[in-house]
Amino acid sequence: MNWRSEHIWIELITGSRKTSNFCWACILFLGSLGFLVVGTSSYLGRNLISVFPSQQIIFFPQGIVMSFYGIAGLFISSYLWCTISWNVGSGYDRFDRKEGIVCIFRWGFPGINRRIFLRFLMRDIQSIRMQVKEGLYPRRVLYMEIRGQGAIPLTRTDENFTPREIEQKAAELAYFLRVPIEGKRN
């Protein structure tokens, strides 16, 4: 959801609470749990699940490797579930022409820098820059060039914008901020 008026533009940023992250976290959790159960059943010599008889999987080396993969997968899936619950990467971009201030807010990982809040004056914005990388994995990112601070990304690298969408977004934002557009192709 985005909100725009004559003087204020607020753009909400989706964080890690995306459908694909939920799917990957579930698949990884269930798969690693399966590996761990098979490794444990080969260690105990009993069938904890009826799909594989425990005699077919020897604990050394197959059971150890499956247990290791199961434990590693559980750690990775717990990392994904934590980023989903903390909603890492979500936030908003607020452009206020009336007060001449730009605010960028993102949620990070817990700790000192959990809240990432950037604030600068609109007169310090030099340009809006599009970085376009074509090829097998195309990448189109929108940056805001700030005097003395460099380029700050406004879009995520995993957002799949078409060339027309990224150009339209850059043009609208540049028009709203009254700054030029720069393009860069790789």
From Swiss-Prot:
The keyword Transmembrane applies. The keyword Nucleus does not apply. This is Photosystem I assembly protein Ycf4. One of its GO terms (biological process) is photosynthesis. InterPro entries: PSI_Ycf4_assembly. It is a multi-pass membrane protein. Its main location: plastid. It comes from the Eukaryota. It is found in: Plastid, Chloroplast thylakoid membrane. Keywords: Chloroplast, Membrane, Photosynthesis, Plastid, Thylakoid, Transmembrane, Transmembrane helix. Seems to be required for the assembly of the photosystem I complex. GO terms for cellular component: chloroplast thylakoid membrane; photosystem I. The chain crosses the membrane at residues 22-42, 57-77. The gene is ycf4. Belongs to the Ycf4 family. HAMAP family: Ycf4.
